[in-house]
Amino acid sequence: MARYEDLPYRTCVGMMLINREGLVFIGRRAGGIEHVDDTHVWQMPQGGVDPGEDTWEAAKRELYEETNVRSVEKIGEVPDWLIYDIPRTVAGRAWKGRYRGQRQKWFAVRFTGADSEIDVGAPGGHKPEFTGWRWEPMQNLPDLIVPFKRPVYERVVKEFSQLAVAV
């Protein structure tokens, strides 16, 4: 097995889905080895980029696969790739031990559909990644994510804070 320091980062996208009231979609994770407690189980949709796939196309695909949502318009993008390391204690089990963390390209989208479009139980025919969901004020997000992802969420919130307005 490769040393933790030598492992690459998984290329990934993240989506901040903002409704017409300026609130952000968060999903309650369906468990996982990084689970630390019942407060830090919420996150925004995110997922891997397939080889040769455009990041925006990957983001739309991941959003659909995790939430069933297609009714969106792109309203923002973090210009940089954001990186986080997973704790060494779970690195050997997460992603079959192939990565030390993720490098993420983040997008903000305005949700133009109705809440009834959201389905985390059988999203787009894929295995559910969330067991529930809710709309949350953007500034609360960093306190709801697993601690090792908090710096990324703080940066995403800072980048998109002006978008948390009712339209």
From Swiss-Prot:
SUPFAM superfamilies: Nudix (SSF55811). This is RNA pyrophosphohydrolase. Belongs to the Nudix hydrolase family. RppH subfamily. It comes from Rhodopseudomonas palustris (strain BisB5). Accelerates the degradation of transcripts by removing pyrophosphate from the 5'-end of triphosphorylated RNA, leading to a more labile monophosphorylated state that can stimulate subsequent ribonuclease cleavage. Residues 8-158 form the Nudix hydrolase domain. Keywords: Hydrolase. The gene is rppH. Its cofactor is a divalent metal cation. It is an enzyme of class 3 (hydrolase).
